[in-house]
């Protein structure tokens, strides 16, 4: 497996996403420029210029025409993917931590941090006709986290009727958007949920937590199905679209790396069997924790974004497909 190294970001990667076809990778970092790359050869197509702070999150819609990003400059921006121009900017009361397009692409959701006297809030906005007036439009729905802890990751549920949120205290909650109320919550994790990703059919989700585990949940009932244990915080986890495999990435938090032995760092991505919960492979690469992981939609490669500012695309060898789990 010879990886592609995508060099271009000056600071740590915060999130990476493939588009639906998998020909493009979108990456955000703690520098101010979200980037788009060809996944096949690693060529950078361009950057989306306009943010004034670290960009925490990114999502691309189903047709790869629009991009949404959330930043520490207290704004969420919508972009035209083809031209790189800003379609609209939504001011926030604090840093935007998560952004997601709904499956239909008609709506988007974003959440803001609990900071500067403001509670953590979740917004649903209509993005069918986006122009500069979106900054003055009121959201379709606003949910305030009064008792709940801060939202750190978010997904849309089935048929755009629900939103699933992962929180700083390790809880995962599912919200009914029509009734604007919480349907269910589980507390299987003990620490911060760093990332959640759906399976390709949307029936399951994998969560990555600072408590050194990743867990597989039913995306409707939030029943915990499987647990993948490691000995270090998990920053990101993804489910293979073609095999019963889960890949985990993580490591120490960046600020703690120097104070631990190198052995405890373990910055490789680790493959677990989805059903048997057993680790069967590791792939080295990054000089620091992996912050974000994504499988290519065809399942033949995957990408990792690290604290070192690189995005690495790993294409699987033939031996990966021949591998039989004993």
From Swiss-Prot:
GO terms for biological process: formation of cytoplasmic translation initiation complex. It is found in: Cytoplasm. GO terms for cellular component: eukaryotic 43S preinitiation complex; eukaryotic 48S preinitiation complex; eukaryotic translation initiation factor 3 complex, eIF3m. It holds the Pfam family EIF3I. Transmembrane segments: none annotated. WD repeats lie at residues 8-49, 51-91, 146-185, 188-227, 285-326. SUPFAM superfamilies: WD40 repeat-like. One of its GO terms (molecular function) is translation initiation factor activity. The keyword Transmembrane does not apply. Component of the eukaryotic translation initiation factor 3 (eIF-3) complex. Belongs to the eIF-3 subunit I family. PANTHER family: EUKARYOTIC TRANSLATION INITIATION FACTOR 3 SUBUNIT I. Component of the eukaryotic translation initiation factor 3 (eIF-3) complex, which is involved in protein synthesis of a specialized repertoire of mRNAs and, together with other initiation factors, stimulates binding of mRNA and methionyl-tRNAi to the 40S ribosome. The eIF-3 complex specifically targets and initiates translation of a subset of mRNAs involved in cell proliferation. This is Eukaryotic translation initiation factor 3 subunit I.
